[in-house]
Amino acid sequence: MPSCTSFPIGTRKSKLAVIQSEIIREELEKHYPHLEFPIISRDTIGDEILSKALFEFKRQLAKSLWTRELEALLVTNQCRILVHSLKDLPSEMPDGMVIACIPKRSCPLDAIVFKAGSHYKTVADLPPGSVVGTSSIRRRALLARNFPHLRFVDIRGNVGTRLAKLDAPDSQFDCLVLAAAGLFRLGLKDRIAQMLTAPFVYYAVGQGALAVEVRADDKEMIEMLKPLQHQETLYACLAERALMKRLQGGCAIPIGVQTDVLAISNSSYRISLLGTVLSADGLRAAFGNAEAVVSSEEEAEELGITVALALLKNGAGPILEEHQRSSDSEESLKNY
């Protein structure tokens, strides 16, 4: 028997975050119809500080931009679970916290959204000097690499805020780059003009997937979440996150991936993982890939590490060091 009848879910206050929490709540209610799963929302540092691009935050702070205030709810027992976009979670979880489950992944791709009424169909159609709105260093680097004639300007805020900025009569933006999964969940699929695919754009580690975080010692909740686990998604995302962890990457470093999964039995999957690391301007890039049959979490992580080592062998090291020097230099100037 459950220890109680109410298991609060913690999430950010944005419309998308609440919708994502409702997705998890609906799944839990299917399995536990006699229990309640109220949603508690909070703003995080990442929601409150909108004047900086994501890659401009100090590395240590960037790791908890979207999570620190929510994790306090777990520690104080105000919530039993937290629902996140997996791509917002650091590759190494804080002490005492674990990802209890990763449900089935939505579309991991990035999408182009043009200004309302625009006649353009693809990003390649944009004339020189056109302004692309994004605060992601990965998206900026990949698009600059393939479309050097474009300009990139930071844009922050929730999806609705960014779309309003795009569509404003005096907007400087010609288009935005957004995660397709978020647009789908918000019912905004009709705003998508183009899906960005490899070899032009590789998506973020964990993009399109949700993650449910709990306290590591909450064995009851971990057990209750097992029916929501999607094995194929879990293995793919574990491989991607192991790659990022080995490279010590985060939102301040342009790391992109593409993962293809083929089920070969009820418990085994053939996973192909390609990773890339780019300089901030996109002019230099390293690529690495590997394929393996995966039937355990350990094997999934081994695949990610293999691709990370291939990236380092193929020139990712100097690029990563350059990002680190740039980050250290900026921090030194701020502290001067």
UniProtKB/Swiss-Prot annotation:
Protein name listed in UniProt: Porphobilinogen deaminase
Chain's role: Tetrapolymerization of the monopyrrole PBG into the hydroxymethylbilane pre-uroporphyrinogen in several discrete steps.
Catalytic activity: 4 porphobilinogen + H2O = hydroxymethylbilane + 4 NH4(+)
Keyword Phosphoprotein applies: yes
PANTHER family, per database record: PORPHOBILINOGEN DEAMINASE
Keyword Phosphoprotein appears in the UniProt entry: yes
EC assignment: 2.5.1.61
NCBIfam families listed in its UniProt record: hemC
More details: The porphobilinogen subunits are added to the dipyrromethan group.
Example GO molecular function: hydroxymethylbilane synthase activity
InterPro entries: HemC, Porphobilin_deaminase_cofac_BS, Porphobilin_deaminase_N, Porphobilinogen_deaminase_C, Porphobilinogen_deaminase_C_sf
The record's free-text note on cofactor binding: Binds 1 dipyrromethane group covalently.
Gene symbol of the encoding locus: hem3
Highest taxon above the source species: Eukaryota
Family under the similarity heading: Belongs to the HMBS family.
Pathway: Porphyrin-containing compound metabolism; protoporphyrin-IX biosynthesis; coproporphyrinogen-III from 5-aminolevulinate: step 2/4
GO terms for biological process, alphabetical: heme biosynthetic process; protoporphyrinogen IX biosynthetic process
Phosphoserine: residues carrying this PTM: S327, S329
Co-factor(s): dipyrromethane
Gene Ontology cellular-component terms listed: cytoplasm; nucleus
SUPFAM superfamilies attached to this UniProt entry: Periplasmic binding protein-like II (SSF53850), Porphobilinogen deaminase (hydroxymethylbilane synthase), C-terminal domain (SSF54782)
Keywords recorded for this protein, A-Z: Heme biosynthesis, Phosphoprotein, Porphyrin biosynthesis, Transferase
Residues with S-(dipyrrolylmethanemethyl)cysteine modification: C251
